[in-house]
Amino acid sequence: MIPNHILILGSPNSGKLRVSKLISNDKDFPEIKENESHSGIIIKTSLSTKYYHIKLNILIDEYPEERNKSVTDEEKLLELEKWFNEFKSEEFGELREVLDGLVFTVNMKADSLEFIEKALETVSEIRTSLGDEESQWDGFISIIGSTTQGESVDDDTVEEIEDLVITHGFEFINLNTQGINEFKEKQGKDRVVELIESHEWTNMELLKVNPDQYEKNKMNKVEQMKQNLLEEKESMDLDVVFSKLSVAKERAEDMTQEQKEKYANEIIEEIIDFI
């Protein structure tokens, strides 16, 4: 089977390895020395759901090139721009063609808001480089924020980072969280897993679904929805539904038409699950 590819890009201590371990379920992970650069690491793994099976190559890259060197925000941005100039060159054309997703990691404690905002401009350029004149790129881009172990970041900073990310048309995931939020959306580590599992990969081996079981599951869900609508339940909070729609509309403002359609379908499914 032909493998799929995703790229995880970030500066040192921004969570690249934690994200890759989460995606690979900590399987097939190479031994990495503490002070060794993460650039060029490739994790060859596989992923199976009840619907499909895929082979997946997780490509990790890092900037700056010297891991132990103390650098300013300006120097990091220059290194990121240098990385992008190489990535968009003809030499890396084959890599761009096979990518199904890009994860850009930031350290919510160490990276300033000014740095993150300018870095997101480069990520926008990366997104543009992944398409061509004939067709749009069908992959996903996610900005994942975290802190080094033992450190915390205040809620206001997290909200400001999320606002910056959404303004640039990307999804933000706070790796320090998990479970579901007040809108019944998966967040943090659970959202990373959901993002990977729900993506329509280029190369998939679809698994056969038992028609009887599929019909049974569908009817069970219809019956559950009917009961929820008929019963007067406190959990049936329309304000939450309207809030979810409002947030979704705001997030979708800067997306492309194709991204909006995909995002809208996801929101519709979540609302159906909620009611």
UniProtKB/Swiss-Prot annotation:
The gene is IRC6. Signal peptide: none annotated. PANTHER family: INCREASED RECOMBINATION CENTERS PROTEIN 6. It comes from Candida tropicalis (strain ATCC MYA-3404 / T1). InterPro entries: Irc6. This is Increased recombination centers protein 6. The keyword Cell cycle does not apply. Belongs to the IRC6 family. The keyword Membrane does not apply. Keywords: Chromosomal rearrangement. It comes from the Eukaryota. Involved in gross chromosomal rearrangements (GCRs) and telomere healing. Pfam families: Adaptin_binding. One of its GO terms (biological process) is vesicle-mediated transport. GO terms for molecular function: protein-macromolecule adaptor activity.
